[in-house]
Amino acid sequence: MSDSKCDSQFYSVQVADSTFTVLKRYQQLKPIGSGAQGIVCAAFDTVLGINVAVKKLSRPFQNQTHAKRAYRELVLLKCVNHKNIISLLNVFTPQKSLEEFQDVYLVMELMDANLCQVIHMELDHERMSYLLYQMLCGIKHLHSAGIIHRDLKPSNIVVKSDCTLKILDFGLARTACTNFMMTPYVVTRYYRAPEVILGMGYKENVDIWSVGCIMGELVKGCVIFQGTDHIDQWNKVIEQLGTPSAEFMKKLQPTVRNYVENRPKYPGIKFEELFPDWIFPSESDRDKLKTSQARDLLSKMLVVDPDKRISVDEALRHPYITVWYDPAEAEAPPPQIYDAQLEEREHAIEEWKELIYKEVMDWEERSKNGVVKDQPSAQMQQ
């Protein structure tokens, strides 16, 4: 590590119950959110002259799950370069050696709001279809690199007032498993696909279910499947969409199948009743056409059996969405993930700590005078 990193580059400020020790270029820190992974502040970058988001990863080495997630997020943010995925602008640590290393700060673009705040606004079809199009483009880009999200929700999708949208994180690592019978834990399960809830195998269109739930919420202004735990989540889905076929039941593990088959049978509610005309914008004949297209898209995304659910590509070509189709956005070249073992890696905490430290040092090496190169996704040799 070069001697250029000295205390004079940093200052400390108290944010809620956490101390942020950040580079002096980042001023006017204001807390804007917190999650399982850490606290996020808005700040002004005096070098670039722009507002940014500074995220402090909370105790990234407290256990292997946190450490793996921190490493994965850092690697993916460095590799992914797409207009519908949040951009990483800087990475730093105030500590001067691996032995002292404790904190990781990620600096990203600052957006105006997350989708939770948009849900209570009345959106016209144009804005709604454009938001969904951008979501699908971002998801497709992640899929092209072998990243299946599995945990899309309004709180990790951010927007600007000009209706541009970006996905904030990379979801569950491939090795993260969800067991249907496990005790309830603190996680937003309302948007998770049946195959994730039921501990089945999954493929790319697992993320389409989440988009369907988010779209349904944008239309209705409230969560559409609001379960109190995993089991109740399943109940809420089948009460509205109906009990799935025997063919679907065969794909379940015996213990899960036994539970699912013993639930009361539900015929399901028609989509015209779940999403009636009056909850959509309807000022013109064109709106009426768009309403019927929007409902059709919902009916193809909110399908319990993933083998019968629409794919990301099919959703991008759906009449409700395809008006926005631009190959440069929908067919962008896949990101090159330089760590081929990213999803499968398992390490002791000290090894994770060293891997993350190397990533932070690599970023600092590639940054000149605190300003990152135009392409943070430039390839590294490992």
Swiss-Prot record:
It catalyses: L-seryl-[protein] + ATP = O-phospho-L-seryl-[protein] + ADP + H(+); L-threonyl-[protein] + ATP = O-phospho-L-threonyl-[protein] + ADP + H(+). The active site is at residue 151. CDD domains: STKc_JNK. The modification Phosphotyrosine is found at residue 185. The keyword Phosphoprotein applies. One of its GO terms (molecular function) is protein serine kinase activity. Residues 26-321 form the Protein kinase domain. Its cofactor is Mg(2+). Its EC number is 2.7.11.24. Dually phosphorylated on Thr-183 and Tyr-185, which activates the enzyme. The keyword Kinase applies. Activated by threonine and tyrosine phosphorylation. GO terms for biological process: embryo development ending in birth or egg hatching; JNK cascade; rhythmic process. It comes from the Eukaryota. Keywords: ATP-binding, Biological rhythms, Kinase, Nucleotide-binding, Phosphoprotein, Serine/threonine-protein kinase, Transferase. Responds to activation by environmental stress and pro-inflammatory cytokines by phosphorylating a number of transcription factors, primarily components of AP-1 such as JUN and ATF2 and thus regulates AP-1 transcriptional activity. May play a role in the development of the central nervous system during embryogenesis. May play a role in the regulation of the circadian clock. Belongs to the protein kinase superfamily. CMGC Ser/Thr protein kinase family. MAP kinase subfamily. This is Mitogen-activated protein kinase 9. The lineage of its organism: Eukaryota, Metazoa, Chordata, Craniata, Vertebrata.
